[in-house]
Regions:
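Feature recognizes metal-dependent phosphohydrolase scaffolds
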Residues: 1-189
Length: 189
């Protein structure tokens, strides 16, 4: 965890992580994990703590499950989560908007004026079609978007939208979208 924080700090101007940490303040996200087996929670917890949580969860109420998950999260990844709270909700370049979940595209060039932080971290609908900038997001599983449960790569609509949430917990692969500023083209690495 410390090595990751040091690396991210060193390369902060090159590597941008668009924060979705607001969702960690209200732990409901833990109980509605799209992969059905707490994949997000598992990614933050040690194997011992994840096993401890799954052994207890059936005996706990929803609120108690959340409290226990948060307790374990803070114990295992508290420093990382605290650091993530300081990250921006979006990052904008001349050509792209990078965001955790999505934006209110109906606002056009005024999208920022009409997009709430809740939408930036919790949007669950897929946007398709042309937009004046490319929108690069995660949050929604590319397996779900593509309709292929085994798909774990980057999904694009061929216009202005790229989704990166590629079930890393299963594949062991982190989808990376590379942009070539000279050609204006993207490629998956």
């Amino acid at each position: 965890e410390k090595a990751l924080l040091d690396w991210l700090e060193e390369y902060a101007d090159i590597n941008r992580h668009i924060c979705g940490v607001e969702q960690y303040r209200d732990a409901e996200w833990l109980l509605s994990d799209a992969d059905g087996d707490y994949g997000t929670l598992r990614s933050f917890l040690s194997a011992r703590h994840f096993r401890e949580f799954t052994e207890k969860e059936a005996r706990l109420s929803g609120d108690s499950q959340n409290a226990e998950a948060v307790r374990l999260l803070l114990e295992d990844a508290g420093e990382l989560l605290a650091w993530m709270r300081h990250l921006p909700y979006y990052y904008e370049t001349e050509r792209q908007i990078l965001v955790h979940a999505g934006i209110a595209e109906w606002g056009g060039e005024d999208w920022l004026c009409v997009t709430s932080e809740a939408l930036m971290v919790g949007k669950t609908t897929v946007s398709r079609g042309n937009f004046y900038k490319d929108v690069i997001a995660g949050h929604i599983s590319t397996a779900k978007i593509s309709g292929d449960r085994t798909y774990d790569g980057i999904w694009s609509d061929g216009s202005s939208h790229y989704y990166l949430d590629g079930t890393t917990w299963r594949s062991g692969k982190i989808p990376v979208l590379e942009y070539d500023a000279e050609t204006g083209r993207y490629r998956e690495r």
